[in-house]
Amino acid sequence: MSAEKNLTELGLTLPPAPPRGGVYKPVLIDGKHCYVSGHGPYLLNGKSITGKVGKDLNEDEAKNAAQQVGLAILATLKENLGSLDKIKRVIKTLGMVNAIPEFEKHPYVINGCSELFAKIWGDDNGIGVRSAVGFGSLPGNIAVEIEVLFELH
């Protein structure tokens, strides 16, 4: 089954691809590698999910924010590649959580994005290697930022 069909069957709506927040490329293709710059939890209304996890958001709200980051990444891929079916697999995900120092469930939060990608590309191709880490702050006080390296067909 195709990634595009899987997305449709999930009934999820992609937000618009986020605008750039600085001097960088949202997507860079090098051979069969597709690098996607860090994305935040961008919503349909153009706003972002903000706040510090463990203070302003609980772990489940943060996990939902990470899923929203995944949707924003999918929107950027579609805008730049034309179709999610051009992606073969997820290679590496780096998830950054804006959290209080005592928060320890960063991997649980980033599962929001990883589980989405597994549903889009299947377990074999949608799950790659990953790091999930905590930060004292993120740009614009966003709750989660994620960057991903994909392999193209």
Regions found by a protein language model. Give the residues of each.
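Short, polar/acidic, helix-capping and beta-turn segments at strand->helix junctions
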Residues: 1-153
